[in-house]
Amino acid sequence: MDPSPLSISIAIFSLLISFLLYKKLTTKLPPGPKPWPVVGNLYDIKPVRFRCFAEWAQTYGPIMSVWFGTTLNIVVSSSELAKEVLKEKDQILADRPRNRAAARFSRDGKDLIWADYGPHYVKVRKVCNLELFSPKRLEGLRPIREDEVTAMVESIFRECTQQDKIGNSLVVRNHLSGVAFSNITRLAFGKRFVNSEGVMDEQGLEFKAIVANGLKLGASLSLGEYVTWLKWMFPFDEEAVAKHGARRDRLTRAIMEEHSLARKESGARQHFVDALLTLQEKYDLSEDTIIGLLWDMITAGMDTTVISVEWAMAELVKHPRVQEKVQEELDRVIGVDRIMTESDFPNLPYLHCVVKEALRLHPPTPLMLPHKASANTKIGGYDIPKGAVVHVNVWAIARDPNSWKNPLEFRPERFQEESIDIKGNDFRVLPFGAGRRVCPGAQLGINLVQSMLGHLLHHFKWELPEGMKPEEIDMTENPGMVTFMHTPLQAVAIPRLPSHLYKRMAVDM
């Protein structure tokens, strides 16, 4: 007698259940909070995720399982486990998880940030390391950075010396944002969209609108991104994303065309768009990859610079002893008859320690961009299945009392007492990541943060608004992938150099 369809179905179902039970019993996942059906731990996670995960690590340990819907996420919160993820198991854990928005924006990983590890990633990484962020190119673009930093100084001086504003506090972030915006658009596109009066041109307004719209679309994630079989209930707004992509590409192509014509007339310049167009044939770079790389640099470099400097300034206003010590070093090395340049950096070790300490306590990306397991592996003795998403809690690691003495104290001297690298070689402090995914623009970021901070402290003394106490500064973070201060820092800027040293050192390049 032939088996009936019902008996075949029952047999298949029984085998499936047996397999799933066997897999569950033999797979040793890291501990973690108990997930709810369908949604996992999504509704247990507090808005500031890295703080929430640090709290959970106190209960479940330095490696834990957190379920985003039906997707397993592994969160590590110790330097030892970070080393295992980013060095010892680096190749297996070097892929990127892409939600639907990231997949569309990156053309399914044709850029650098969202590319899986493979031949394409290796190629574009080589372009970044050898060409875009080479010491020679960074030095060639230095005049742009120094131009924009001195423009910031000029704008602060103009505001704080107005007759009706002397002694008033200013919103520090407003002045930092202008530097970051113009610096990154000039480095990437060779475009300063803002004139000397602060008026933005039409192309600049379009650029800002594209950036804002991209952030809005990227943040609008639905439950369907975390529960694969619910995607049909949460349709992706393909039309809105397609319009955004077309708008972004239209602006970028127009700028690329301008540079292509200029190259024919006067040769290539140092900007990233010129470099990529020049290298397009040598490295077989598609137009999608060139556009993707340009926007990777913009999204990675704009907010993170502002965040890093604002947090550093908050700590320096809160700790006047440290501020005075930096200013003593600046006065000793530079004096009061000229302004600082990047060539002064080797003679300003304490300033560099302040930058390191600020990045330790306030990494701009506190949860490293997620990695994905390309095969089954183990971390800390636990099973990590293929497809699991792995997060490194950089913020928690940098505040771990097992790695740092008095970890919550802002004390730059700790970097004088011990030589500690912050570009991926010391797993206790990882503001730029490490391993195959380490940020290729780390040195550029450090240079700009150090330059901005040095000029702010050399040109001005910074104080709290009248009547405000240091402990009243809001040192909490906004939710999000990057850590803006929840309340923008306000401080009083008091000029400390001769007035002729507050002029912008403009360059045309």
Swiss-Prot record:
Highest rank taxon of the organism: Eukaryota
Function: Cytochrome P450 which catalyzes 3'-hydroxylation of p-coumaric esters of shikimic/quinic acids to form lignin monomers and caffeic acid. Involved in the biosynthesis of phenylpropanoids and Amaryllidaceae alkaloids, including haemanthamine- and crinamine-type alkaloids, promising anticancer agents.
Official protein name in the record: p-coumarate 3-hydroxylase
Keyword RNA-binding belongs to the record: no
Claim: Iron is one of the keywords in the record: yes
UniProt-recorded Gene Ontology molecular function terms: heme binding; iron ion binding; monooxygenase activity; oxidoreductase activity, acting on paired donors, with incorporation or reduction of molecular oxygen
Residues that bind heme: C439
Topological relation to the membrane, as annotated: Single-pass membrane protein
EC number(s) given by UniProt: 1.14.13.-
Family statement drawn from the similarity comment of this UniProt entry: Belongs to the cytochrome P450 family.
Alphabetically ordered keywords of this record: Alkaloid metabolism, Heme, Iron, Membrane, Metal-binding, Monooxygenase, Oxidoreductase, Transmembrane, Transmembrane helix
Location relative to the cell: Membrane
GO process terms (BP): alkaloid metabolic process
Predominant place of localization: membrane
Pathway named in the protein's UniProt entry: Alkaloid biosynthesis
